[in-house]
Amino acid sequence: LLIDIRNTLTLRYDPTIEVTSSVPKLASEQIKIKRNGTYPSSKQIEKELRKIINTAISRHNPKAISLALSTGVDSNLMLSLLRDEYPNLDIKCISVSFDEAGEAVYAKKIAERKDTDFYNVIVDNPLKDLPFLISIVKEPRWNLYQYYFIEKSKKFSDLLFTGDGGDELFGGYTFRYAKFLSLFNENDDWKQRTIHYLECHERDWVPDQEKIFGESIEFDWSSIYSLLRVYFDNDLGPLDQVFLADYNGKLIYDFVPTNDKFFNYLGI
């Protein structure tokens, strides 16, 4: 348990636990094989996305669906594809904001342009609900805002679409890639590359990280580095190593299992 706490409060997830996920893990060898093949075109990727959407809609045959909408590329793309495939489908767009002057104003305009209903959930004090949300996910997490749009979506439909995972699947963290490459040197070993990677996720830990734990948790950075070694101790290119770490890290151990726990709790 103490190791779980150490890892979660440093990486935002604990890669030592077993998770059940519909999203498969990837190994460096799989990426290497793909890189030696033919890259899919944007049209092929679009076709695959439409196929996934159609499969989900056909399986559930909903009268209405919910969509978690922000002003980001991922959820906007999802909305555009859904409306293009189903021009008459009743779509409820849901945004979560922590003040009335947030991005919800722009998200509403996007929703209206696609002829959908828009709902904004304003969370006045996110810290107030944190103990309750942590009791659901059973982990010391702070990034649990998705509960609010999942809860709201339950009022409209049992089928919810989100843009979660778009950055990990399609390389959306460009600001982090730029920083990683600026720190990267061809002679860096796996440990130095791991350090660079963590420096690009500085919002997940604090500069004096080793001081926030008591004596019961023997914190040292070497233990954290070893958890990520598999992603950087291989012959992939530097950005492919970052993609592998992002995909197998936050997507597999953070976004997917956290959302699944909320889905199960709320019956989505």
PLM features: residue spans?
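N-terminal glutamine amidotransferase
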Residues: L1-N36, P40, K51-I57, Q146-Y147
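Short hydrophobic-aromatic micro-motifs
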Residues: L2, R12, L160-T162, L251-I252, ...
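ATP-dependent adenylate-handling active sites, centered on carboxylate activation for C-N bond formation
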Residues: R35-V242
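Short, intrinsically disordered, charge-balanced linker/junction segments flanking boundaries
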Residues: V121, A245-Y247, L251-I268
